[in-house]
Design a protein with these regions (language model features):
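C-terminal regulatory/interaction regions
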Residues: 2-5
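Active-site-proximal loop/helix segment associated with metal-binding centers of metalloenzymes
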Residues: 130-138
Length: 138
């Protein structure tokens, strides 16, 4: 009996990339503005060629509609990520808290959506990227 393993999504890093950063489980929320400020400072200063956001970027994301609400936290987060995506490639993977992030979010921010899991080929190595919540079996 042979077991068939479905193919995983793959992303091949451009040859010029030398540094990538991985962030996960920031759980951004309006009640914790210091976390958003820390993310802003990080995004303005990182020398990374690309940034990977591996799930639970938000404590909760109820849908892309909130981006349009005046002075909304979601709108501020989206604007921050859009600015960062103009500087370097940004990638986003759903977590169990922000699985409703959708096409409108990615369109407006310029952040590319990754499947979970995705294999990243970078500097002649293969890296398995996953949020990991699907691995919690108990």
């Amino acid at each position: 009996m042979q077991l068939a393993v479905p193919p995983m999504a793959e992303l091949v890093a451009p040859a010029g990339w030398r540094t990538v950063d991985f962030l996960a489980d920031l759980h951004l929320e309006p009640a914790q503005p210091a976390t958003l400020q820390a993310l802003r400072q990080y995004l303005e200063s990182t020398p990374a060629d690309a940034v990977f956001l591996l799930g639970d970027l938000f404590e909760v994301w109820v849908g892309d509609d909130a981006i349009d609400e005046p002075d909304s936290f979601e709108g501020a987060c989206s604007a921050l990520l859009a600015g960062a995506a103009r500087q370097r490639p940004m990638y986003f993977m759903h977590g169990n808290r922000d699985f409703l992030v959708g096409a409108e979010f990615t369109r407006r921010t310029g952040v590319a959506l990754l499947a979970d899991p995705t294999v990243l080929q970078f500097l002649d190595q293969r890296w398995l990227l996953s949020h990991g919540d699907a691995l919690c079996l108990n």
